[in-house]
């Protein structure tokens, strides 16, 4: 598996209902076995974190164009991003 974690800053307090709708709309794009899951979580009222789980680095790279388009369209400021191959997964041990 391959992970992407990001932190995002909003100009206003997070609209969680709208964000759930946005994520639901992305399900059609992410309906393959290559995107395992996407999770968004609140850090504070104007900052959220994101975890994307891909089946492989290649799957992540394949999704990059669509992901970057969504990022640009969001109007949010990305504070950080980390990516990497998993090497230990508790549910697999």
Predicted region positions:
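Low-complexity, intrinsically disordered Gly/Pro/Thr-rich segments
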Residues: 68-72
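Short S/T/G/P-rich N-terminal loop/turn motif that feeds into the first structured element of a domain
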Residues: 1-49, 55-66, 76-93
């Amino acid at each position: 598996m391959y992970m992407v974690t990001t932190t995002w800053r909003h100009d206003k307090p997070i609209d969680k209902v709208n964000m759930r709708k946005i994520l639901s709309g992305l399900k059609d794009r992410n309906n393959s076995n290559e995107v395992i899951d996407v999770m968004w979580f609140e850090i504070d009222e104007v900052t959220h974190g994101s975890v994307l789980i891909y089946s492989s680095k290649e799957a992540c790279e394949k999704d990059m164009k669509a992901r970057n388009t969504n990022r640009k369209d969001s109007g949010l400021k990305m504070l950080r991003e980390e990516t990497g191959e998993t090497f230990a997964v508790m549910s697999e041990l």
